[in-house]
Amino acid sequence: MRSFALLLLLSLLLPSSAPAEENGVRAFTPCRACHSLDPAERGLPGPNLSGVIGRAVGGVAEFDYSPVLRKARDEGLRWDAKRLEAFLADPAAMFPGLWMSMRGIEDVAERQALVRFLENTTSR
């Protein structure tokens, strides 16, 4: 009985990752109009985002990227959490001439939740 009470107490004290993941899923919802996390899905307006963290910018071979992203790829830029968060804040400022129409995510917490979500989907 004592060990059950201790486990119950610990479960209440430890932070849950469920709300954070829910925030990331919610933040990704508008992205689904153009992007997928299913590595097998092709033919969408935007590149597949499965495994985006650690991947070269403009790194999905069969996707037709804007010239600015092809240049970034040729320069060896890679997506990490910091670069992705800055990109999501203002994509066109980071890559002028970008074909993507998304203006950016103003809310810092929402951007961070989306980046964490993409990191977690990359590491699964």
Q: Regions from the language model: what does each represent?
A:
Residues 23, 41, 75-79, 106:
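Extracytoplasmic/periplasmic, Sec-exported soluble proteins
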Residues 20-44, 49:
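Sequence/structural segment immediately N-terminal to covalent heme-attachment motifs in c-type
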Residues 14-15, 36, 54, 89, ...:
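Residues at helix-coil transition
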Residues 78-124:
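C-terminal capping alpha-helices of c-type cytochrome domains
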Residues 4-15:
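Bacterial N-terminal signal peptides
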Residues 52, 56-59, 91-95:
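A short secondary-structure junction motif
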Residues 59-78:
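Short Fe-S-cluster ligation motifs
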